[in-house]
């Protein structure tokens, strides 16, 4: 299924359709503020494991990141001190991944990770999907060492 969402005008009905797919354990490809990424609901282990297989990685050991909608949601899934909070408040949303200690709210699949990558991209589509879903998305760029970056950042190619 192809659903077109536009950053300057995300259609709520289309967003709900994508979120329904995520809740059913589906995987999406969507834009962030840097590259296109695979995404899934962090509470759907089979979807997380599928993305890890696409990337030829072990889901329990690989460096997969989460996209959160705001600092409040970040604080639910990761521990941050005052310094980290101030740095994040100053730089997010933006093209950064912050490496933080995970909290007790992480899904079982991620419990053994000491550090998780947390993102809040400057991209309305990504943030709207997370808002509607109600919890973070697990994401991994579709970029591999063999890919041309332009191909992954230009949806017309």
Report residues per predicted region.
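Active-site-adjacent structural elements in enzyme catalytic cores
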Residues: 1-157
